């Protein structure tokens, strides 16, 4: 298999120029292009002030991007927030696709705090994802994914927590709140699979300066699976309190809310330990730890729900979902 080309500014300019010529608007130097991320392979580019160009750099990403175009059309009528619209798509290199999307106005959840009204927007998002017919999503190629074992995740988090304690990053006794029986009670319930965005991180939530959630980006990782995964993602993006309030407003009961909370908590412990192991003494490494530390703090916010919940067999787990 040949090596995929690395996108460059010249690559992007040539592609944008060709698109402008097709649209009959060529002329002049064309819009400014610049990579969105400062590091890594520059696969996402700003094109002027109004568009975003995303370039697939491997076959798997190509398949996911092609599926995303159809999935966004399926999701759009069900959710109260904006979903990106593609104005052009095709191949930028043999077998590798591009999508040129309209930029959604606003910042991210890493730049703006989500307000109470924004939490209602998130509730509408979770509710809308639950309403997307699973069979229609499957026909688009959205995969079904089995729920993760919370007990296995808990054990892995416990195993690395002492390393974080020695680095003065985390108090391992906090994990004692989740016991093996507690993890078993928070197992995903049969028949609860819904469409899950699966990457509701702060950078994928478009938030306006007034705290409203205006849109959701990057649907390439969407699956049919455990709704607690999106609650966990929101806990990392906006904090456990806001995530649980949004999920409760969307109709989810205590069990999926607490499951999402503990998925997020264990994930952040594991991620911070991984990032600490990989660091050196340089200033960039210190900066790279800022976001994992912030997400850990958000996930470990104390919430009232976990203090007042006692599970029984007849507990209501959430909406009556059909997968």
Question: PLM features: what roles do these ranges have?
Answer:
Residues 65-66, 228, 286:
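Conserved strand-to-helix beginnings and helix N-cap segments that scaffold or border functional pockets
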Residues 60-62, 193-196, 201-257, 261:
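Active-site Asp-x-Gly
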Residues 30-149:
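ATP-binding pocket architecture of kinase catalytic cores
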Residues 7-28, 91-92, 105, 115, ...:
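An alpha-helical support segment within catalytic cores of ATP-dependent transferases
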Residues 48, 96, 191-193, 212:
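Conserved catalytic motifs of the protein kinase core domain
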Residues 41, 109, 232-323:
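Helix-rich C-terminal or lid/interface subdomains of diverse kinases
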Residues 24-26, 77-80, 168, 241:
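Short helix-capping segments at alpha-helix termini
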Residues 91-95, 210-212, 265:
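Short strand-connecting beta-turns/loops that link adjacent beta-strands
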């Amino acid at each position: 298999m040949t090596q995929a080309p690395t996108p460059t500014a010249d690559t992007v300019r040539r592609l944008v120029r060709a698109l402008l010529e097709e649209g009959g608007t060529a002329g002049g130097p064309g819009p400014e292009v610049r990579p969105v991320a400062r590091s890594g392979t520059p696969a996402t580019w700003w094109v002027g002030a109004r568009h975003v160009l995303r370039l697939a750099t491997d076959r798997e990403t190509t398949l996911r991007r092609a599926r995303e175009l159809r999935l966004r059309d399926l999701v759009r009528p069900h959710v109260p927030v904006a979903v990106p619209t593609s104005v052009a798509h095709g191949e930028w290199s043999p077998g590798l696709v591009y999508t040129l999307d309209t930029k959604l106005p606003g910042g991210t959840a890493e730049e703006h705090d989500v307000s109470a009204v924004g939490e209602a927007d998130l509730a509408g998002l979770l509710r809308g994802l639950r309403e997307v017919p699973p069979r229609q999503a499957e026909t688009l190629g959205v995969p079904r994914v089995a729920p993760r074992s919370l007990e296995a995740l808990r054990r892995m988090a416990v195993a690395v927590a002492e390393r974080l304690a020695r680095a003065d990053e985390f108090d391992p006794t906090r994990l004692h709140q989740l016991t093996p029986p507690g993890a078993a009670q928070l197992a995903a319930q049969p028949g609860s699979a819904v469409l899950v965005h699966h990457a509701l991180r702060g950078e994928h939530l478009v938030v306006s300066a007034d705290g409203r959630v205006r849109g959701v980006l990057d649907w390439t990782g969407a699956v049919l699976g455990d709704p607690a995964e999106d609650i966990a993602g929101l806990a990392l993006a906006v904090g456990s309190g806001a995530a649980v309030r949004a999920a409760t407003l969307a109709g989810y009961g205590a069990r999926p809310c607490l499951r999402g909370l503990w998925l997020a908590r264990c994930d952040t412990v594991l991620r911070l330990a991984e990032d600490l192991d990989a660091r050196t003494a340089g200033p960039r490494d210190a900066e790279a730890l800022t976001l994992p530390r912030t997400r850990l703090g958000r996930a470990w916010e104390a919430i009232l729900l976990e203090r007042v919940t006692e599970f029984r067999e007849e507990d209501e787990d959430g909406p009556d979902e059909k997968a």
